[in-house]
Amino acid sequence: MTTTTETWQLFAHGRVQGVGYRAACADRATSLGLGGWVRNRVDGRVEVLASGPRERLEALRVWMEAGPPAAQVSKVEVAQAAPQLFDRFDWLPTA
């Protein structure tokens, strides 16, 4: 059985900056075997671009809705993105 790789762009809204969200998100994505990146946005959101099997992307989305203990996530937006392959999961500078 072949696993199809998808790429999703996700935005976490709420109290998601200054609470360890990016580090915890990168750890979770890495533990799920996903590639991609996470970064803070100047508007207060956290943006994620992640590639991997749909079920692992869905697991990341579910985690993002709760986040680390200090986070207060109000919503997570998800959109399909152009397929991309990544070797690892990185942090990018704020954009």
UniProtKB/Swiss-Prot annotation:
Q: Which PROSITE patterns match?
A: ACYLPHOSPHATASE_2 (PS00151), ACYLPHOSPHATASE_3 (PS51160)
What are the Acylphosphatase-like domain coordinates in residue numbering? 7-93
| Superkingdom of origin | Bacteria
One annotated GO molecular function: acylphosphatase activity
- Keyword tRNA processing attributed: no
Keyword check for Hydrolase: yes
State the active site.
R22, N40
- InterPro entries, per database record: Acylphosphatase, Acylphosphatase-like_dom, Acylphosphatase-like_dom_sf, Acylphosphatase_CS
Q: Which Gene3D superfamilies match?
A: 3.30.70.100
This entry's Enzyme Commission designation comes to 3.6.1.7
Q: Which principal EC class is assigned to this enzyme?
A: hydrolase
Catalysed reactions, as listed in the record: an acyl phosphate + H2O = a carboxylate + phosphate + H(+)
UniProt keyword list: Hydrolase
Provide the family line: Belongs to the acylphosphatase family.
Q: What is this protein called?
A: Acylphosphatase
Source taxonomy:
Bacteria, Pseudomonadati, Pseudomonadota, Betaproteobacteria, Burkholderiales
Encoding gene per record: acyP
